[in-house]
């Protein structure tokens, strides 16, 4: 039975094994300790079903035999319910897209947010529309329209349900805030103002501290704990990344939060950070923008097209670099990457923070900090008193929860590129997904050991879900179900 232990999330009489009701599961921590998936699943082994899905990066949300996902086409946002046993579409609804956006990053998508449900109401969120609440059969309960945040990298946080409330990260909007709505009516209960915060992809995280129900939200160099009752700020920690994608997680009185962003590196370090370790970019091209053009400007027209760019973070953010939006990158747009630009306020770091206290608890409660092997997007995983991190390039790190002492650091998985999906724990194993489509089964231990690897041959942005010892993975074009 789901109970309020460290978190006060979704109260229900459903067993934890039969639901994965929101981003990162029943307790929003990405763990399914009593389940076990096949160790040898692949595209042609232990595959129960595979169905096509619309475009979208949201993760599957599951309540017993129903799966909820979102997606979109050029005209409409879509929210869909599937039969978990067969993949059959049970119902599908849509809302109009008022404006087609071109994002600065290839990972930008108008349907990033994972649905959330308590078994009676399902919450869908689209930043360019608002909040939509239905019952499990798709009947509309209410809507709450919001002004779009309109981030050039899209919106990436997910709505969270806790104690009959819905919490939504609104950082960077005209109403920059943490928004709390009544789950049953959609009416605003409170809004904690967060002025001067830039957009972040951090999902709110419910946590119980003594007799207080808190909501943790990170962004713009801070992690703030708010009262879930009235939005009052209880405590905060500073010295974190200015732009953050991971979400916090807590276990045994320790909150783990932080990440990595290019905003906090410059010059040679910044250039090297935007290329994959296995790329064909020469060492000379990493030091000199002219050499880079000489290497990749195939038609020698003094400009680089998207096709000419090597696979890299730079290619993923081509629209961001192409400031005049003419479809090409010229030297004046590329060369600034190589300069020692001032770093944005904040720093790349992962912190272990003791819960408790009030006000600024940075000096009093930060137990440890980690500066290597930091994730850009994937949230930290706490399992069996160890913290696991999955970083760009296919590097895994494992540290002790209470001390931050490394058990292993930056161990290679063997597949480079980005790691957008957050790692999850299932029984004695971890599941880690590479953006390139590889899915790793790793031993949940103090030593890095890869048990199995399969390749879905499609890009992966979404975090997997596990229910009844079956794993559900959303790739670029399909949703997959694996199990016995």
Task: Annotate each language-model stretch with its function.
Residues 13-484:
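Noncatalytic, solvent-exposed loop/strand surfaces
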Residues 1-8:
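Bacterial N-terminal signal peptides
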């Amino acid at each position: 039975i789901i109970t309020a232990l460290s978190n006060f999330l979704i109260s229900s009489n459903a067993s934890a094994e039969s639901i994965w009701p929101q981003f990162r599961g029943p307790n929003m921590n990405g763990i399914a300790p009593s389940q076990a998936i096949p160790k040898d699943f692949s595209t042609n082994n232990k595959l129960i079903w595979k169905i096509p899905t619309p475009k979208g990066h949201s993760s599957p949300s599951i309540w017993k035999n129903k799966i909820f996902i979102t997606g979109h086409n050029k005209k409409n946002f879509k929210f869909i319910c599937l039969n978990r046993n067969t993949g059959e579409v049970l119902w599908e609804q849509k809302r109009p897209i008022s404006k087609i956006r071109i994002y600065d990053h290839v990972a930008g998508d108008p349907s990033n947010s994972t649905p959330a449900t308590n078994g009676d109401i399902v919450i869908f969120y689209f930043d360019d529309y608002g909040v939509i609440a239905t019952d499990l059969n798709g009947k509309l309960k209410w809507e709450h329209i919001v002004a779009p945040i309109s981030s050039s990298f899209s919106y990436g946080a997910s709505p969270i349900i806790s104690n009959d409330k819905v919490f939504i990260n609104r950082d960077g909007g005209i109403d920059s805030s943490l928004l709390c709505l009544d789950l049953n009516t959609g009416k605003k209960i409170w809004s904690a103002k967060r002025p001067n915060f830039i957009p972040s992809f951090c999902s709110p995280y419910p946590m119980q501290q003594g007799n207080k129900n808190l909501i943790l939200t990170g962004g713009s160099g801070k992690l703030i704990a708010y009262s879930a009752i009235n939005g009052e700020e209880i405590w905060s920690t500073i010295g974190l990344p200015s732009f953050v994608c991971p979400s916090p997680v807590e276990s045994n009185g320790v909150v783990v939060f932080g990440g990595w962003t290019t905003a906090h590196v410059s010059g040679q370090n910044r250039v090297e950070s935007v290329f994959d370790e296995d790329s064909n970019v020469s060492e000379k091209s990493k030091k000199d923008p002219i050499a880079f053009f000489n290497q990749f400007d195939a038609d020698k027209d003094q400009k680089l097209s998207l096709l000419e760019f090597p696979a890299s973070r730079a290619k993923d953010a081509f629209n961001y670099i192409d400031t005049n939006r003419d479809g090409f990158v010229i030297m004046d747009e590329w060369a600034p990457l190589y300069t020692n630009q001032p770093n944005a306020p904040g720093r790349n770091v992962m912190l272990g923070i003791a819960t408790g206290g009030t006000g600024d608890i940075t000096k009093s409660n930060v137990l440890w900090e980690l500066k290597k092997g930091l994730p850009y997007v994937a949230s930290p995983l706490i399992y069996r008193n160890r913290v696991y991190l999955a970083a760009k390039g296919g590097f895994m790190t494992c540290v002790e929860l209470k001390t931050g002492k490394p058990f292993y650091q930056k161990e290679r998985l063997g597949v480079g590129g980005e790691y957008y999906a957050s790692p999850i724990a299932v029984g004695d194993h971890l599941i880690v997904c590479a953006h390139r489509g590889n899915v790793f089964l790793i031993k949940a231990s103090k030593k890095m050991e890869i048990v199995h690897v399969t390749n879905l041959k499609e890009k992966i942005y979404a975090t997997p879900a596990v229910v009844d010892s079956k794993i559900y993975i959303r790739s670029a074009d399909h949703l997959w179900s694996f199990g016995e």
